[in-house]
Amino acid sequence: MINLILLGLPGAGKGTASERIVDKYHLTHISTGDMFREAMANKTKVGLEAKSYIDKGNLVPDEVTAKLVEERLSQPDIKEGFILDGFPRTTVQAELLDGITKRLKKPLTNVIALEVDEDTLIKRLSARYMCKNCGATYNKLSKQPKVEGTCDRCGSHEFYQREDDKPEVVKNRLEVNEKMNAPLKDFYQKKGLLTVINGEQTPEKVFEDIDAVLSNNQ
């Protein structure tokens, strides 16, 4: 069984890598954003608790997020293992996750960090733009529409760039994220779970390196 956390700054390629890992290893992809939406829609006890904070514009406390993660990891669909997306973000959350995986007897097997130079990340993120009509995401470096100037999904010709994808904003976002990411890497390094992979490579080569690490668990 593979129970995995994928770490990396925005633009490091976690989304693409996650899809490939899920396809090959049949892991359950667990996103905290999706969990919150699902729990609130289903009006579960933890979902309602989280909603009470969100409705007031407050951050959801770590303990509530951890309860939600534990609820999700307890579900029967996690047979082959899981890949966690968006949790933990801090060492406090990592400690809480430790407790959860021990209680559920589903220990983490791997923590993989995708390392990409800041300049590359800024280039990647500030190349992103979106369809004004349907929100489809494109990238000037890696994912242009099939027909230039026409959205693949809805056929619209209007595009825009989000404020937080502009270079100066991207730089600030990366600095904030790195402050959170570095202690997490140290935390898992000390536990002997961390593997660092060069995220500057092609998506195919990145997955090849991840695959080499994960195949040792089978």
Curated annotation (Swiss-Prot):
Q: What is known of its domains?
A: Consists of three domains, a large central CORE domain and two small peripheral domains, NMPbind and LID, which undergo movements during catalysis. The LID domain closes over the site of phosphoryl transfer upon ATP binding. Assembling and dissambling the active center during each catalytic cycle provides an effective means to prevent ATP hydrolysis. Some bacteria have evolved a zinc-coordinating structure that stabilizes the LID domain.
**What EC number(s) does this enzyme carry?**
2.7.4.3
Keywords tagged on the record = ATP-binding, Cytoplasm, Kinase, Metal-binding, Nucleotide biosynthesis, Nucleotide-binding, Transferase, Zinc
Looking up SUPFAM superfamilies in the UniProt record yields: P-loop containing nucleoside triphosphate hydrolases (SSF52540)
Please list where the region (NMP) is annotated. 31-60
Disulphide-bridged cysteine pairs:
none
Q: In which pathway does it act?
A: Purine metabolism; AMP biosynthesis via salvage pathway; AMP from ADP: step 1/1
Which family does the record assign? Answer: Belongs to the adenylate kinase family.
How does this protein assemble?
Answer: Monomer.
Q: Give the GO cellular component terms, alphabetically.
A: cytoplasm
Q: Which residues bind Zn(2+)?
A: C131, C134, C151, C154
Question: What exactly does this protein do?
Answer: Catalyzes the reversible transfer of the terminal phosphate group between ATP and AMP. Plays an important role in cellular energy homeostasis and in adenine nucleotide metabolism.
| Major location category of this protein | cytoplasm
Q: Which domain of life is it from?
A: Bacteria
Q: Where does AMP bind?
A: T32, R37, N58, L59, V60, G86, F87, P88, R89, Q93, R162, R173
PROSITE patterns named in the record:
ADENYLATE_KINASE (PS00113)
> Which GO molecular function, any one, fits this protein according to its record?
zinc ion binding
Q: What's the protein called, per UniProt?
A: Adenylate kinase
Give the record's GO biological process terms: AMP salvage
